């Protein structure tokens, strides 16, 4: 990868490389895309029992409010995906969920929810039964975290 030779790249290249390295090291990792133009990684930390924000460009771990509080971004949609799942994780990254909801106008919320659910179920269907169970349990815990 040219990125490792030059050590120059944008957030997308760094997030792709970091996510791939995490997976190669045996971690569950997924790429996170923010519609206002930034990309980073989430890594599942077994000891924590949850997904952790990891931004290789900023060299930060588990500081999900960095973008709104530190950078002053007005996030709209933040979607995490891997070859096993896809999920709207916006709530993890926003300070005020109600204000965020007012900014989300690109697509109908119900349409987005249904389409993410359908895609997630297709990805889960490609997994072994034991993995499906783990993914479903993690998903339920994550939904509690995001909505609680």
What are these regions (language model features)?
Residues 25-28, 37-39, 50, 75:
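Core residues of folded domains in eukaryotic genome-function proteins
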Residues 44-46:
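A generic structural motif
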Residues 3-32, 41:
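Cysteine-centered nucleophilic/redox motifs
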Residues 1-6, 10-13, 33, 48-148:
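Alpha-helical and coiled-coil interaction segments, frequently adjacent to or embedded
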């Amino acid at each position: 990868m040219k990125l490792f030779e030059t050590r120059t790249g944008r957030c997308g290249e760094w997030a792709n490389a970091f996510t791939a390295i995490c997976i190669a090291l045996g971690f569950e990792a997924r790429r996170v895309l923010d519609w206002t133009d930034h990309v980073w990684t989430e890594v599942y930390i077994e000891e924590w029992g949850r997904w952790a924000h990891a931004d290789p460009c900023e060299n930060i771990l588990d500081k999900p409010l960095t973008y709104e509080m530190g950078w002053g971004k007005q996030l709209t949609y933040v979607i995490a995906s891997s070859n096993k799942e896809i999920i709207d994780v916006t709530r993890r990254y926003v300070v005020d969920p109600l204000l965020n909801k007012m900014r989300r106008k690109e697509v109908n919320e119900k349409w987005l929810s249904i389409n993410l659910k359908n895609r997630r179920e297709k990805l889960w269907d490609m997994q072994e039964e034991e993995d499906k169970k783990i993914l479903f349990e993690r998903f339920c815990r994550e939904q509690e975290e995001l909505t609680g």
